[in-house]
Swiss-Prot record:
This is DNA-directed RNA polymerase subunit Rpo5. Keywords: Cytoplasm, DNA-directed RNA polymerase, Nucleotidyltransferase, Transcription, Transferase. Its main location: cytoplasm. Pfam families: RNA_pol_Rpb5_C. SUPFAM superfamilies: RPB5-like RNA polymerase subunit. It comes from Thermofilum pendens (strain DSM 2475 / Hrk 5). It catalyses: RNA(n) + a ribonucleoside 5'-triphosphate = RNA(n+1) + diphosphate. The gene is rpo5.
Length: 80
């Protein structure tokens, strides 16, 4: 039986975290943003599918960099 590929475990895919509604609301309030002002990620994106993200959810992306250290970004899940 073939092994299933887990996109979240690939070395080139940064850590993605699906935020709860409460976490997303706290984040948006702290940053003074509306959900509509966040960059998008489509619900059909392989990582969004692996996280079972639904349109309207917010995903936190944590990237490691040898020069910048750690970079955190947020994406709004859109139907797509």
């Amino acid at each position: 039986m073939p092994r299933k590929f887990d996109v979240l475990e690939h070395e080139l895919v940064p850590k993605h975290v699906l935020l709860s509604k409460e976490e997303a609301n706290r984040l948006l309030k702290a940053m003074g943003l509306k959900k509509s002002e966040l960059p998008w990620i489509y619900s059909t994106d392989p990582v969004a599918r692996a996280l079972k993200a639904k349109p309207g959810d917010v995903i936190m992306i944590i990237r490691q960099s040898p020069t910048a250290g750690e970079s955190v970004a947020f994406r709004l899940v859109m139907r797509g």
